[in-house]
Amino acid sequence: MKRPIGILTFIFGAVLVFLMFYCVYPPLTYANPPQDVKLGYDSNSQTLTVTITHKSSFTGFHYVKFVEIKKNGIGVITNTYGSQPNPAIFAYNYKISAGKGDTLEVTATCSLSGDKTATLDFGK
């Protein structure tokens, strides 16, 4: 009789610890890096469009916090955001000149966990 009670106590304790962790720090259960970053460039207007896929139910708490743009390996733009405009897919536009031989690298960083980088190469 003692053995089944001990197992049930252990299982109950493990479930209780998991639920306490889940309730005390829920962001870890929702934290994920951006799933995708797509780049588009309009040479006429010299505008870089960065389309980011980052699913979040709490866009004011779990969002893409930084977007960093490097041109030929040198950081030229870093924008900091306090929320995400859409809970799944959204785009930002940046004025930046680029031409033949240039490379643009964009990194989107989650406010809680991880980042995703995309590169646009303009060839030689």
Residue ranges and their predicted role:
Residues K95-D102, C110:
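Surface-exposed, short loops/turns at beta-strand junctions within beta-sandwich domains
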Residues S56-H62:
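A short beta-turn/strand-edge loop motif at beta-sheet boundaries
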Residues A108-A118:
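Short acidic/polar inter-strand loop motif in beta-rich domains
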Residues F66-K70:
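Beta-strand signatures of extracellular beta-sandwich domains
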Residues P26-P34:
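Proline/serine/threonine-rich low-complexity linkers at boundaries of modular beta-sandwich domains
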